[in-house]
């Protein structure tokens, strides 16, 4: 079993292997190219082209290629991916991410974003949210605060810190922050596969407002709010802040959905079969 495309170069020749790509990384670089300068567009498109060729070469040499969602698997197939291509979705440890076992207290409305804070899509998401969504929310909810929770915040992320914007850096445990959230937000514009940050917030029974990109790939059945523009996100968050009962009901439904759909035992069954670990 080999995890992530970066490690594929170390696979011994002739050894049967299952390759877990997680996402189609070449497609991610193609997306980066769409938003960069002329020089960056050229570089990112070149990286996407070369990486795509490498991904296809690897997939032709292994027993199976795994992706984190059926959408990613279908994208890889459409791009010429060879061999057996299987979707093995992310799951969640719902026993660990259980609000019943976490104490948290907060004063006033708190919005929480979690993630690795030197990862470009996360950096861009929180910067956009702080600049575009928070000012709209403050017009109707002046006491609202925004917590950016995650390790290795870049200088750009640290510069967002203000009396009503908390930049935590690394934390020992993200669960108290999730438990304290009035609403968890995932305003990513670029996202691939399934966002663990969204599943974790749902498992903690928190109401979630996610961008279409962040919600894509999650079979949420309406148990989170999907909102695209800054105005739409501000309205969705504001409505949940104004109606705590509705917010609580949405969070409870989100946890129930995670328990039903994203339990690790069910999610890993295809991998067990591929590795010959089934009963």
Regions found by a protein language model. Name each.
Residues 223-231, 238-245:
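Conserved acidic donor-binding segment of nucleotide-sugar-dependent glycosyltransferases
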Residues 197-200, 207-211:
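Short hydrophobic beta-strand element within catalytic cores of glycosyltransferases
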Residues 11-15, 59-68, 73-92:
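Helix-loop-beta element that forms the nucleotide-linked donor phosphate-binding surface
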Residues 264-279:
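C-terminal alpha-helical cap of glycosyltransferases
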Residues 63, 165, 179-193, 204-207:
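Acidic donor-binding loop of glycosyltransferase active sites
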Residues 14-56:
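Acceptor-binding helix/loop patch of EC 2.4 sugar-transfer enzymes
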Residues 60, 75-78, 87-180:
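Conserved catalytic-core segment of nucleotide-activated headgroup transferases in glycan assembly
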Residues 246-261, 270:
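A short, well-ordered alpha-helix in the C-terminal region of glycosyltransferases
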